[in-house]
From Swiss-Prot:
The modification N5-methylglutamine is found at residue 230. This is Peptide chain release factor 1. GO terms for cellular component: cytoplasm. Belongs to the prokaryotic/mitochondrial release factor family. InterPro entries: PCRF, Pep_chain_release_fac_I, Pep_chain_release_fac_I_sf, Prokaryotic/Mito_RF, RF-1. The keyword Chloroplast does not apply. Methylated by PrmC. Methylation increases the termination efficiency of RF1. It comes from Novosphingobium aromaticivorans (strain ATCC 700278 / DSM 12444 / CCUG 56034 / CIP 105152 / NBRC 16084 / F199).
Length: 354
C-alpha cells in the first residue's frame, strides 16, 4: 500500500495543527483531552510519514544533481535510499492501518481449566503465571479478581485485570484453547497426557460505556468457601450477581469485604457485557474479521505446549519455537505475540491492497 505525497502532506499539516493547538494553552477540559488523544494517535504515523517524505525528497534532489564531481557520491546515496525506502513505506502503511478502538484499553484475563481434570487446572495456573511474568516485563499491573483453586495449587478458573499501555493490543490474540502435552505430577506410570485450558482476553470498558440498571440485577450474598469446600471466613461476604436481561452470572468471594467483592463482580459483569456487544458488532463485520489471525473464536485450538520435546507451536501461523521453558517464564512469549501481531498486520495490508 503506497501512500501518495499529497497524503503525506495532509498528515504533516494535521499533526502541526494539533501541536499548535496543544501548545497554545487555550484548550480546556474535553477539548484538551480530545486533542491530546488525537495527537497521541497521530504521532507515530506522522513521524514515519515525515521520514518517508524526506527520503522521497532526497531521491528527487539526488537524481536531478548534474555536477559530475558529485555524481558518484550521489549514485551511492541514491542506492542507499532506494534500498531503505520500501521498509520505511511498509512501516508507514502499518502505522496507518485502522486501529481496533479497544487496543489501548486494559483487559480482563480469564483462564479456565478444560479437559484433563487436576492436570488441566495445574496447566491453567502455569498459563496465568506466564502472563503475570510477561505483564511485569511490559510494565503492566495485574490484579487478581477471583480464583477457584484446587488442592494441588491448580486453578479451575482465574480472572484478573491487566492494566497498562497497549494491553489489549498485545494480549487479544491469546484468546482460545491452549493445549499441553506432558507427564502429569499425578501420573505414576510416566505416560504423557494431553490437557487443555481456555483463555479469554476481554477489553475492559469505562463505566460510561456500559450502563447497568439496578432493576436488571439479582444479587445474592453467601458464605465464601475455599478449595475442597472448607469455609475461609465466617461472614456472608461472597457475592453472586445475575444480569437478568442477558442471563450472565458473575461470582466473587476472594475479598473479605462484601462491598469489595460486589465491586469486583460488577467490574467483571461490565466487561463481559461490553464483550458481548463487541462480538455482536463484529459479527456484522464478518468479512473484516476474516483478515484477522485465527477466527477469534475462543473454542479454537490455538497453541500446543509439548513438554517432552520442549516446543511450543502456534497453529494459526504455523510457528514452532523450541524454547518452552523461556516462553512459560515470560520472556519467550514476546516473540510469539510479536509474530502474531506482524501476521495480523500483513493480512490486513493484503486485504486493503486487494
Amino acid at each position: 500500500m503506497s501512500v501518495s505525497d499529497a497524503r503525506l502532506a495532509q498528515i504533516a499539516a494535521r499533526f502541526a495543527e494539533l501541536e499548535a493547538r496543544l501548545a497554545s494553552g487555550t484548550l480546556e477540559g474535553a477539548d484538551f483531552i480530545a486533542a491530546s488523544r488525537d495527537y497521541a494517535e497521530l504521532e507515530p504515523v506522522a513521524r514515519v510519514a515525515e521520514e518517508v517524505r524526506e527520503m522521497r525528497g532526497e531521491l528527487v534532489s539526488l537524481a536531478a544533481l548534474d555536477d559530475p564531481d558529485m555524481r558518484e557520491l550521489a549514485d551511492e546515496e541514491l542506492a542507499r535510499i532506494r534500498a531503505e525506502l520500501p521498509e520505511a513505506e511498509h512501516r508507514l502503511a502499518v502505522a496507518m492501518l485502522p486501529r481496533d478502538s479497544a487496543d489501548a484499553r486494559p483487559a480482563m484475563l480469564e483462564i479456565r481449566a478444560g479437559t484433563g481434570g487436576d492436570e488441566a487446572a495445574l496447566f491453567a495456573a502455569d498459563l496465568f503465571r506466564m502472563y503475570e511474568r510477561y505483564a511485569a516485563e511490559q510494565g503492566w499491573r495485574v490484579e487478581t479478581i477471583s480464583v477457584n483453586a484446587n488442592d494441588l495449587g491448580g486453578y479451575k478458573e482465574v480472572v484478573a485485570n491487566v492494566a497498562g499501555q497497549g494491553v489489549f493490543a498485545k494480549l487479544k490474540f491469546e484468546s482460545g484453547v491452549h493445549r499441553v502435552q506432558r507427564v502429569p505430577v499425578t501420573e505414576s506410570g510416566g505416560r504423557i497426557h494431553t490437557s487443555a485450558a481456555t483463555v479469554a482476553v476481554l477489553p475492559e470498558p469505562d463505566e460510561v460505556d456500559v450502563a447497568i440498571e439496578d432493576k436488571d440485577l439479582k444479587i445474592d450474598i453467601y458464605r465464601a468457601s475455599g478449595a475442597g469446600g472448607q469455609h475461609v471466613n465466617t461472614t456472608d461476604s461472597a457475592v453472586r450477581i445475575t444480569h437478568l436481561p442477558s442471563g450472565l452470572v458473575v461470582t466473587c468471594q476472594d475479598e473479605r469485604s462484601q462491598h469489595k467483592n460486589k465491586a469486583k463482580a460488577m467490574q467483571v459483569l461490565r466487561t463481559r457485557l461490553y464483550d458481548m456487544r463487541r462480538e455482536a458488532a463484529q459479527g456484522a463485520e464478518a468479512e473484516a474479521r476474516k483478515a484477522m489471525v485465527g477466527s477469534g473464536d475462543r473454542s479454537e485450538r490455538i497453541r500446543t505446549y509439548n513438554f517432552p520435546q520442549g516446543r511450543v507451536t502456534d497453529h494459526r501461523i504455523n510457528l514452532t519455537l523450541h524454547r518452552l521453558p523461556e516462553i512459560l517464564e515470560g520472556p519467550g512469549l514476546a516473540e510469539l505475540i510479536d509474530a502474531l501481531i506482524a501476521e495480523d498486520q500483513s493480512k490486513r495490508l493484503a486485504a486493503m491492497d486487494g
